[in-house]
Amino acid sequence: MKKIRILDCTLRDGGYVNNWKFGFENIKDTVKRLIQAGIDIIEVGYLSSKGDFSADESQYSSVDAIKRILPADRKNTLIAVMINCGDYDAELLPQYDGTGPDCIRVCFHKSQALQAVELCRKIKDKGYKVYFQPMVALSYSDAEYLGLIGMANKFRPDVFYIVDSHGSMKQKDVARFFYLIENNLDKEIAVGFHSHNNLYLSYSNAQYLAALHTDHNLIIDSSIMGMGRGAGNLNTELFVEYLNETADADYSTEPILCSIDNTIAPIYLTTSWGYSLSGYLSSKYRCHQNYARFLSNKNTLTYVGMNAIFSKIEPEKRDNYDREYIDKLYTAHMSAGGE
C-alpha cells in the first residue's frame, strides 16, 4: 500500500515572496515547528554557489551553512535542499554523514535534462537521496516525458516529480502525467507533485492524487499558508488536516499555527501572496508567473488589456521569463491605444 508524505517547501518556494530573508532565528524556528508537527520532509531552501548569502537567508553556499539551522534532534523528519541545475557543482558536496541535508532536489529545464541526470548521479554517489524535478511538465509531449522516465529508471532517483510550474494543471493533466509514470516508472521510485495555486486547484489536485490506487509512494509539496511566488502553493495546514482525516495520518497542527504566528503571518501583512486575476491569466496561457507580476506592476492595464498581451506571447517565450520581450509587447499594446 502506498505511503503519502508531505514535503514542506515554505523556506524555499516561500522565499520568492521575501527574497528568502526570513531571518536566522525564524528559519530555525520554522524548521523546529515543522519537525514538531511531524512533517515528513522539510525543504530548507536553495543550495547555490552563485551568491554570497547571509545567515538570515534561506539560501546557502555550503552544506555547513545548512547545518547551522538544523536542530540536534530531527526525529523522523528528512531535511531537503534544492539545487537549480547549473547553480552548484556536485564536487563541492561533502560525503553524506547525516548531519546536514538528507535529500537534494535537482530542478531543471527541458534543455538541461542530460546535465541534470549527470548531476543527480554524482549527488547519489555521495550518499544523498535524490529528487528528480523536471520543471513545467506541461511543456513535454508524452514521448518526451516517457524519455525522462526512461532516464530515471536507469539512474534511479528516490523521487520523480510532476511539476505544475505555472499553476495551469487541471485534474485531467495531473492524470495524464501520473499514468505515464504509473505504467512506466520503476515501482521503487516515489512520485512527487509540486503545484501552484493560480487556478485554486492545488488542494483538489493533491486530493485526487492521494485518492488514487497506486503502488508508488507519493510525496506532496506544500507550504505554510500556501506561501510562494504569485498565487502560492498548496497550504500545509490544510493538507495536514486532510491526511489526518482520510489517511490515518498523525500530524500536529498546533506547531504549524505557532510558525504562522511567529514568522509567516507577519510576512503576509507586508508582502501578500495568493490568487490574483493576473496570476489566473498567466496560468491560462501557461506562462511564467513573472509576466503576471510585470504587467500587474504597471498599474495601467485593464484585465482585458492584460489578457490581450498574454495572448500574444509566443509559445517558445512562455516558460522562461524574458523582461525585455514582455516590455516590448506591453509598449506595443499601449502605443496602439490599448488599455
Positions of predicted regions on the chain:
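Catalytic cores and adjacent flexible loops of soluble metabolic enzymes
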Residues: 1-339
